[in-house]
């Protein structure tokens, strides 16, 4: 029997994505100035970045990177366990661990690599299970599959559902994993309830707070805002590529867990360390995030303004008090049409479609930054309301005439 033709398969899959409105072409950014971006030759006001505190272009952060690169070079030159672990890596790990109240931290090149490392190193035996929120980030879900562990999912934010799933998997070691702030909905996991579930079911509780640290509560993220610490959440992921404006991630945890990851996690062992200059930039960003409460205060005010203006215009908001503000569109084509109409008016907002979100839940994902102004927020909401009307009119005009009604 002939093998399937991979080229024919990918062409068929691409044609299907075209028909569904799910193509994802890359956009080329040539220049940035705060929240203004030149994209494919057009200047747009962006509301789709994860640079929540506006630190990616902060002068002192950029200066820290440049100074460290001039001293230490462009790269680490080796993995952490050979000769790539630099004093700047060590300083960053200690600073973040101290900030969030954990004994130790371990630096990774990305959040995806960190999530894979945690599950590959800890869920290593037959019958091990990872119970997860149905809407967890793809990196958490994929990590379970790639680690070879069993994956069980519970309904979104449902701590009782998590308990049921753990009870149905009594054999093998167990991990309960959740996002802290959910990247597509912007809501926050019920961490206190989930922590109790993990304790009762003898499961290791792991929180990926990529979108919470720097923003939620006093800046220490969703775990601290829930009044929890290392005794409740033995492992926590912090990313450097969201509120902290850089790239990379850290896993924070108990001494024994972090030591085990450093010695056995393949994504940590078999990759070159993050450039020391990037660690220097992240270190400065962490210090600013800890010190400059005005950034969070301004961001909180902008979130409240956006939601107030959106309600005034009758937009379909979701329950989020974080910088992630999704506006449901329903079908994929409407989301793309809305995003395109906004771009034509000078605004850059991403259309998020399956498989990133569930079927029928396509949306505009608006993300706010401390760099935005109230005028920009009001202008965006007005543009969204106008785009909604234009797209709805186009849909009505394209619809076939109604069938005649016979008595």
UniProtKB/Swiss-Prot annotation:
One of its GO terms (biological process) is biotin biosynthetic process. Keywords: Biotin biosynthesis, Pyridoxal phosphate, Transferase. The keyword Transferase applies. Substrate binds at residues 24, 137, 356. Pathway: Cofactor biosynthesis; biotin biosynthesis. InterPro entries: Aminotransferase_I/II_large, AON_synthase_class-II, AONS_Archaea/Proteobacteria, AONS_Proteobacteria, PyrdxlP-dep_Trfase, PyrdxlP-dep_Trfase_major, PyrdxlP-dep_Trfase_small. One of its GO terms (molecular function) is pyridoxal phosphate binding. Pfam families: Aminotran_1_2 (PF00155). Pyridoxal 5'-phosphate binds at residues 111-112, 183, 211, 239. The modification N6-(pyridoxal phosphate)lysine is found at residue 242. It catalyses: 6-carboxyhexanoyl-[ACP] + L-alanine + H(+) = (8S)-8-amino-7-oxononanoate + holo-[ACP] + CO2. Belongs to the class-II pyridoxal-phosphate-dependent aminotransferase family. BioF subfamily. PANTHER family: 8-AMINO-7-OXONONANOATE SYNTHASE, CLASS II AMINOTRANSFERASE/8-AMINO-7-OXONONANOATE SYNTHASE. Homodimer. This is 8-amino-7-oxononanoate synthase. It comes from Stenotrophomonas maltophilia (strain K279a).
